[in-house]
Amino acid sequence: GPHDKVLGDAQIHSAISNDGINFTYEPGIRFAISDRDLRDPAAVYFKGKWHLYIPNQRNDGTGYYASSLDGLNFVRQNNVKISNKGNWLGNATVAKSKISFFGTVWRATSPNGIDWKTNRSTLGPDPAVVHLRNDSWLAVTFRKIESIK
C-alpha cells in the first residue's frame, strides 16, 4: 500500500508566534522516533501537561503518543489506539474535562489522554475543530465539490 513507501526520519519541530500570523522557528527537535516519519502532529494542553499525537503511517487505528510538561521536550509513551480503522491525522482540543480528537472522518474522546473511545463523525479530511464559549463547536475541513451546473 501507499504507506509501505513512507520512509525517512521526519521529526517534530516547533515555532512560536505573538500574533498567529508570523512565526519564529525554535531550534531543536521536540520529538523523534528513529526510522519513522513523523508528520502532521496534533498537540493539546490538558491537565497540566502537553499531549502530542502523530499518525502511524503504517498502522491504521494506532498513533504515536508523547507527553511533555513544558511543551518543548516530549517523552514517548505507549501508542494510542482506537477500536476501528482510522488515522490519527486531525485535531485535538479540550472541552468538558475531556480531550476530543477529531480525526479524518472519525472522532474520539478521552478522559485522560491515553484511553480513547471512538464516536461517529461526519467530518471530512484533517479537520480543525474548536469548542466555542457558547458550548458549540466550529469545524473547518474540506470536501471535494463536483462542478456546479
Model-derived features: where do they sit?
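Beta-rich carbohydrate-recognition and catalytic domains
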Residues: 1-40, 44-149
